[in-house]
A protein has these predicted regions:
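Active-site anion-handling motifs in enzyme catalytic cores
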Residues: 1-302
């Protein structure tokens, strides 16, 4: 059972978190539409780094402030994560979260650190893990291969480059696999691959989710430093190794036993992990707690 049932029988509005809630002119021109949002039965916030310890920052991922967030009051976190850009939660951020986030339900967060953040500002939260993991049941993971295949699709992260380590990763994959595919998740990833001088013989996958799904469904393995690229591969029942380049992957691997190798240890650890046999087992997901969280919303009712 996955998170999709929260939406299956309901009218859903989608608003981007990275753009401001609205301007006064937009409210005058689109008051009816915005009123539907303001009066929604449930407002769900999703996002890896939707929250931060200090919301007094330029271009916050959830682009709200204390003056314009009233329309989003009562928002409920769904598998939300938090970034740390200060040593503690300041007064402004605490006041903002207490104003905009619901006090009536328990929030769903993806890791213990985010749970503690919300608890520090006086809100209730359960660590349900990222909703993308909810379908990775023991029965699902049993269908994932224990040993490597002949082909692999890999990813890179252009905004977090490490040319020496990323070349080393590709070199390991060339030695272990007969055919390499590269999926550019964002617009600059292909240029980064080419800048490494490592694109020869690599087949480029269409830069869309459909393209990624298509190559995974051919039965290839996944190796790369795109966290959710790896999780998506697991959802498609493909063997996956995530290369950790930031705290998001490390936190989720620590809590849920995702198959992971540190980028700093690529040269020593990746080849052994690729070549060895191991089962995919996602630990730490509390299925009963997830069902308890969903039960707050009467999800079976249209």
């Amino acid at each position: 059972m996955n998170w999709c049932e929260l939406f299956s029988s309901n009218y859903v509005m989608r608003l981007a978190t990275h753009t401001p809630m609205y301007t006064p002119a937009q409210y005058l021109l689109s008051r009816r539409k915005l009123s539907i949002f303001k009066g929604a039965d449930i407002k769900l916030l999703c996002g890896t780094n939707a929250l931060y310890t200090n919301m007094l920052r330029p271009l916050p991922t959830w682009n709200i402030n204390y003056l314009n967030c009233g329309m989003a009051a009562g928002t409920v976190c769904l598998g939300v994560g938090a970034g740390a850009n200060s040593s503690s939660v300041n007064f402004y951020t605490r006041a903002l979260y207490r104003k905009v986030l619901s006090h009536d339900v328990v929030h769903s967060v993806r890791d213990e650190r985010t749970k503690h953040l919300l608890e520090r500002v006086g809100l209730r939260a359960w660590n349900t893990g990222c909703p993308t993991l909810w379908g990775l049941t023991p029965e699902h993971c049993e269908t994932i291969a224990h040993t490597k295949g002949d082909e692999v699709v890999f990813t890179l992260t252009s905004y977090h480059p490490n040319p020496r380590k990323d070349r080393a990763m590709i070199d390991v994959l060339r030695r272990s696999y007969s055919r390499l595919y590269f999926w550019p998740q964002t617009i600059d990833d292909l240029g980064y691959l080419q800048s490494l001088g490592a694109a020869d013989g690599v087949e480029i996958v269409t830069p869309s989710l459909a393209g990624f799904r298509e190559v995974l469904d051919r039965g290839v393995d996944y190796v790369g430093n795109r966290l959710h690229g790896g999780i998506f591969a697991l959802q498609r029942k493909r063997r996956a190794i995530i290369v950790a380049i930031d705290y998001r992957a490390r936190e989720m691997a620590k809590d849920y036993s995702l198959p992971l190798v540190e980028r700093d240890s690529i040269e020593t650890d990746l080849a052994d992990l690729v070549e060895s046999s191991w089962p995919t087992r996602i630990h730490g997901l509390d299925v009963d707690l997830i069902e308890k969280w969903k039960a707050q919303f009467d999800v079976d009712k249209p």
